[in-house]
């Protein structure tokens, strides 16, 4: 958005397909097009390997871009952009990925290249109609506290046990009337946590969201009063929707849970910091 405003034009972005960016950035007025980078961990994506690189060069070349900003230190992407005949290529310093600060590096890059001072507060834009439609469909009421629980996560060490969420739900419900919206993925371990919560005493006050696309969950999240999430995609989404978001940091660098002023990280008992292999759940 900052680049779009500075250059007074819409921008196209290239992002990994599994980022689901098309589902939560599709209403951003600053974005002209979202181009999917089809690469995966199994190296079987459409853009993996030498032939995949050639395909990506051809696709980018067809867009006839005249300027690009590369938010990583990859020589591969530098060469791809040059071979796609993009004349004006701006990029992080090559071969400097180690110990890069995910937020500060981007801010320094934009400041150096475009004299931009960008605040670390990403925001997701939603149509007011979608927010109101979700409010009616799911019967949101101001007499209740509507709480998003981001109970899923990309790895076992990031997922807080169901029992912890259940205890929290019981304590909240003893104070005031609450509704809980359960956001998670659909892998086996995530569904085990989901089903344990649904089988608890407060299961009747829950609405599960695992059957919805991310784009369908956003208006629901926007209607919530607060969000309590593992370090998962839903913590980032709810904070970007300006919902106060408590992030349960168990096994991920603290940076991922406090870069947005709407995030309030909680660390494991006895820990002053958290990073990979803290194993704090």
Language-model segments: residues:
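Catalytic machinery of carbohydrate-active enzymes
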Residues: 1-281
